[in-house]
Regions:
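Hydrophobic-ligand binding "helix-grip"
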Residues: 47-50, 63-110, 116
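Short Gly/Pro-enriched turn/cap motifs at secondary-structure boundaries
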Residues: 10-11, 59-61, 91
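A conserved amphipathic terminal alpha-helix motif
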Residues: 2-3, 117-146
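Short beta-edge strand/loop motif at the mouth of beta-sheet-based domains
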Residues: 17-18, 24, 36-69, 78
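Conserved catalytic core of Hanks-type protein kinase domains
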Residues: 32-33, 73
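Short acidic N-proximal helix/loop "leader" segments that mark the beginning
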Residues: 1-17
């Protein structure tokens, strides 16, 4: 009997999920994920966004060049884009997927974000903390716009 060799492939991790309630309707909240001027108010220092399937998704988030492309854009209900860090060997540009759902609840919007395909638990933990923090900022920004 020979001992098994540990796999060198990263194990898939559970998706990161975060949800917030924003005091504004979905048509006010949705553009914060598609309009570069609004993205720089809550998550990025600079943004280049072409919000159509196949369009560029590029944010500079605290010195990290997040890069990908829009996969689905269904205003004001759902947006999905690929995500990764330009130049990263562990999480290359476009190798994970972020889905954001916008659900009207009275005059508010419940935003539910799911980030899939992160390669390691360390990336999962850092992205969970990051998304939770940035969505908290979004609550104040988009809520004041509604």
């Amino acid at each position: 009997m020979t001992p098994s060799t540990p796999s060198t492939e990263p194990s898939p991790t559970a998706p990161v999920t975060a949800s917030v309630r924003i005091a504004a309707p979905p048509d006010v909240v949705f553009p914060y994920f598609t309009d570069p001027a609004l993205a720089t108010r809550w998550i990025a220092t600079s943004a280049l966004l072409d919000a159509r399937p196949g369009g560029i998704f590029s944010l500079d988030v605290r010195g990290n060049p997040a890069r990908g492309e829009y996969l689905e854009v269904d205003p004001p209900r759902r947006v999905m884009f690929s995500w990764g860090i330009a130049g990263s060997e562990d999480l290359p540009a476009g190798t994970s997927t972020v889905e954001v759902l916008f659900e009207a609840d009275g005059e508010d919007t419940v935003v539910t974000l799911t980030h899939r395909d992160l390669p390691t638990d360390d990336f999962r933990r850092s992205h969970q903390a990051g998304w939770s923090e940035f969505l908290g900022i979004l609550v104040g920004e988009a809520g004041s716009a509604g």
